[in-house]
Amino acid sequence: MELLSEYGLFLAKIVTVVLAIAAIAAIIVNVAQRNKRQRGELRVNNLSEQYKEMKEELAAALMDSHQQKQWHKAQKKKHKQEAKAAKAKAKLGEVATDSKPRVWVLDFKGSMDAHEVNSLREEITAVLAAFKPQDQVVLRLESPGGMVHGYGLAASQLQRLRDKNIPLTVTVDKVAASGGYMMACVADKIVSAPFAIVGSIGVVAQMPNFNRFLKSKDIDIELHTAGQYKRTLTLLGENTEEGREKFREELNETHQLFKDFVKRMRPSLDIEQVATGEHWYGQQAVEKGLVDEINTSDEVILSLMEGREVVNVRYMQRKRLIDRFTGSAAESADRLLLRWWQRGQKPLM
């Protein structure tokens, strides 16, 4: 029994030392990463090649064994000839002049604070660097909106394409509401699925106030400001009617800026009719001029593959270990809020 007790004590010491070393190592790595700029990675995926391979695999699967054998032999010969031709061109220093126009496909699945704009800005910069005449951009967008400044920046990033006269199509399969629509309206063309949620051109803000609860517990709160409207409404302090009025005024000003922006992007839109904060399904949004066409992103991309090379560009942020945990928690919270929002905004089926 005494031997077992000594062994347990020895084991506990070993575990303590190992944990202490691991903690110190983690702190050192974290500090080193914090001081080092975290550069991401640009990933380019050829969707045209993927579609071609999928089509060929399906065709081969429908053949009998003899046909498959002949097909594989022909494909092997074809690929060998293509590789040989490419090698010969490279050896002679020839540059391909018959390249097809490209369709650059970007993705934006927005969270409440629109932090995905950090990747979007890099993707757009990459597209601008490689863009050639006859190319175009398709953005697959999904967002219920969020922080004004975050989505304002995201819309401004898309504006960079518009300023360069680069054709931009935004596709909405599920939702592009509020800040999401602020981004979508920058496009030359908006394509929506029939039951995607579109619109919600409005501004909302809400917060609880715990002042009466704190007073009932004899807890005093002091709030000192320099500037008459440094704080309008607070969580803990006592709100005044003057503060509430100023807060509503700021909301209305933000709403007007939102309306002006949408009107500038889509001049033919009856902004007063659609800027009520309401949302509509895609097939209703077409009638109101909020979107231009009813279709899915899949069909849009497939239709553009004829005579073009379709390429998906993604900028992947490198994350520290601690950021991965906090990021996962934030994404879970965003998904939960989105689920509640969707349930409250539309009937269930």
UniProtKB/Swiss-Prot annotation:
Key word Transmembrane helix present: yes
Intervals, Periplasmic compartment: 1-8
Keywords from the UniProt entry: Cell inner membrane, Cell membrane, Hydrolase, Membrane, Protease, Serine protease, Transmembrane, Transmembrane helix
One Gene Ontology biological process: proteolysis
EC number: 3.4.21.-
GO (cellular component) term, any one: plasma membrane
Classification via CDD domains: S49_Sppa_N_C
KW Cell inner membrane (keyword) present: yes
GO molecular function, one term: serine-type endopeptidase activity
Cross-referenced InterPro entries: ClpP/crotonase-like_dom_sf, Peptidase_S49, Peptidase_S49_N_proteobac, S49_SppA_C
Cytoplasmic face of the membrane: 30-349
Transmembrane region(s): 9-29
Active site residues per record: 178 (nucleophile), 230 (proton donor/acceptor)
Enzyme class: hydrolase
Topology in the lipid bilayer: Single-pass membrane protein
Pfam family, one: Peptidase_S49_N
Places the protein is found: Cell inner membrane
Function, in words: Multicopy suppressor of the HtrA (DegP) null phenotype. It is possibly a protease, not essential for bacterial viability.
NCBIfam families from the UniProt entry: PRK11778.1 (NF008745)
Family per similarity comment: Belongs to the peptidase S49 family.
Protein name per Swiss-Prot or TrEMBL: Probable protease SohB
Annotated organism of origin: Escherichia coli (strain K12)
Higher taxonomy: Bacteria, Pseudomonadati, Pseudomonadota, Gammaproteobacteria, Enterobacterales
Gene name, Swiss-Prot/TrEMBL: sohB
